[in-house]
């Protein structure tokens, strides 16, 4: 019927955000799967691409920082607008994008305050940059997947990354010099 998504701080001491997701239209819930997505960080391109969500992307922060070839092709094909940085948002582009959800980031556990400027737009805040371990950052794919009902796919991708990481880590066990 619905899902509750909790976003914890990396030390798991604090709940930073709580999202309620539902496949039905319900007050106070984010309807999933999301149909129109915008991103205020080019870092999220890796998660978007890995989950195959390019077709849902309707706006990005700054095109010059997107390295993903598949996303760049979608940007050109659809003449996707640039939103700019969180500090200097192109308000017209943000409103014209008509995104159902905007991926953004919070600073040190707090939001950027952008949701107060746009109370009718739904923001989902990621804190992957606070992770100190590579697998912690990789695991954020599960967060991005929840809004598209792609949790099983995200779990599979993460487990593959985890296995590869652990195999590579095992190869370096006997390495004496570690820069």
Where does each model-flagged region fall?
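Generic preference for hydrophobic/aromatic residues in regular secondary structure cores
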Residues: 1-5, 19-21, 57, 120-122, ...
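Extreme N-terminal leader/targeting regions
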Residues: 1-18, 111-118
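A short, structured surface patch at a secondary-structure boundary
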Residues: 9-23, 27-108
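Extracytoplasmic substrate-binding proteins
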Residues: 36, 92, 96-105, 109-179
């Amino acid at each position: 019927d619905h899902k509750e998504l909790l976003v914890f701080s990396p030390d798991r001491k604090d709940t930073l955000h709580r999202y309620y997701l539902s496949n039905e239209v319900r007050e106070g819930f984010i309807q999933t799967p999301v149909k129109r997505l915008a991103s205020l960080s080019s870092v999220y391109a890796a998660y978007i691409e890995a989950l195959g969500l390019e077709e849902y992307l309707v706006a990005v922060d700054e095109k010059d920082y997107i390295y993903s070839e598949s996303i760049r092709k979608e940007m050109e094909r659809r003449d996707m607008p640039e939103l700019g940085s969180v500090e200097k948002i192109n308000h017209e582009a943000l409103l014209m994008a008509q995104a159902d959800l905007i991926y953004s980031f919070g600073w040190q556990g707090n939001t950027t305050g952008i949701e107060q400027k746009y109370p009718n737009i739904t923001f989902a805040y990621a804190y992957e940059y606070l992770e100190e371990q590579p697998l912690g950052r990789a695991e954020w794919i599960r967060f991005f997947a929840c809004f598209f009902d792609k949790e099983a796919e995200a779990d599979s991708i993460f487990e593959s990354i985890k296995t590869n990481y652990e195999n590579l880590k095992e190869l370096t066990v006997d390495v004496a010099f570690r820069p």
